Amino acid sequence: MIDKERHGDYLGKTIQVVPHITNEIKRNVKYLGEKYHYDFVITEIGGTIGDIESAPFLEAIRQMKWEMGKNAVSIHLTYIPYLKAAGELKTKPTQHSVKELQSQGIQPDILVLRTEKHLDEGIMRKVASFCNVDIDCVVQSEDLPSIYEVPVNMQAQGLDAAILRKLDMPVGETPTLGPWRSFLERRKNATEEVHIGLVGKYDLQDAYKSIRESLYQAGTYPDRADRAADERDPLRPGGSAGYAGARAGGH
């Protein structure tokens, strides 16, 4: 945008968040689909509703949803906290999150409820009612043993069909997800292990997320990879003895 302004594309006008920045955001989203002829373009707005950093992006999404009508659908991921001391699930944070999103001019079409505990139908209906969302468009994403089980869980709740309905598209036969389910079965039924030592600089596990997931996936063909999380700091002269247990291929 700075280059465009200096080039004179804005004819000397003062650059503003609306419409200049929001138009640029929309242009990039549309360009991705037009350039590669995608059927669907998924755009994620990270952060928390109400953050000042995300305001221009939310406004751009609001405009796109208004301009595209049935060709756009908004899915809001929100959190249902579990109070262990009281043994209670709280829906208020979700209600306030959706209310804040609505104040930005965006009515979510679908809600995905992130939760540690399974949500019963009563909670699902309560959220649907207070958030003005169809009950069949409220799905839960509870903690699972593996993140790779999430797509199967989402399909079982009809998330894919809900998206198609909101886009006014025909709902065909339910995919079997055969290759995906086979992948999960191989992981669960692995009989051998390969131990791999990973030496890194940071303690934060997400810093090496791509490496960990690559090993996870590779370990299903046909064995399971057992990754050892090691710190970099102790790795100094004479400090390699602790890594003697790390091995590959059983050696």
Residue ranges and their predicted role:
Residues 1-225, 229, 234-248:
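Flexible phosphate-sensing "switch/lid" loops adjacent to ATP/NTP-binding sites
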Residues 251:
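Cofactor-cradling patches in redox/metallo enzymes
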